[in-house]
A protein has these predicted regions:
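C-terminal scaffold of the Radical SAM
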Residues: 1-111, 161, 171-176
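Minor-groove-contacting beta-hairpin "wing" of winged helix-turn-helix DNA-binding domains
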Residues: 135-139
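Short, amphipathic alpha-helical interaction segments positioned at domain boundaries
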Residues: 141-176
């Protein structure tokens, strides 16, 4: 109730909600935050810093002495093969007021968005999501339960991937 009241109050005072927990006057949204939500590349420098460059996500060690010594600088790293970028796109896009761009999803991740539409229609009926010109976004009420929505969408993506893998294993290469 307090969250929805804050959303209304901020809107009445000229602030736009551009992310699940961020508001700004028009034209003043944090470019730093949006870089993460839009899955743009970023570089971090120093102990504990994270980067996502060229399809590789990595983090430097947190311990300053180890960092200065220059030995085993990376504490973790993931490549495109180990990252679930399609799910990350869905999760991060749903944190923004813009929401998911269906054509971008299909073009970038080479999979159909249609299986997710059924879930979004259910969320729309419940007042949790609304269609946009390009796809879907969550409503303020949807932001309140976004974690549950995101988990359901993750399950739907996993089922779609399994269906594609099963079809490919049997020699059926039609787009699933």
């Amino acid at each position: 109730e307090m969250y929805l009241s804050a959303v209304d109050t901020l809107a009445q005072h000229g602030y736009e909600q551009y992310e699940i927990s961020n508001f700004a006057r028009p034209g003043f949204a944090s470019r730093h935050n949006l870089k993460y939500w839009h899955m743009d590349e970023y570089a971090g420098f120093g102990p504990g810093a994270h980067s996502d460059l060229g399809g590789v996500r990595f983090a430097y060690v947190r311990d300053i002495d180890r960092y200065i010594a220059g030995q085993l600088l990376l504490s973790e790293s993931e490549t495109e093969e180990t990252l679930a970028r399609d799910f990350e796109y869905v999760m991060l896009s749903l944190r923004t007021a813009e929401g998911i761009d269906r054509a971008y999803f299909e073009r970038t991740y080479r999979q159909r968005f249609a299986p997710l539409d059924g879930l979004f229609r259910q969320y729309e009926t419940a007042g949790l999501a609304q269609p946009t010109e390009k796809g879907w976004r969550l409503t303020p009420q949807g932001f309140l339960v976004s974690n549950s929505i995101i988990v359901a969408l993750e399950d739907a993506l996993a089922a779609q991937k399994l269906q594609r893998q099963t079809a490919a294993a049997s020699g059926d290469y039609r787009i699933v």
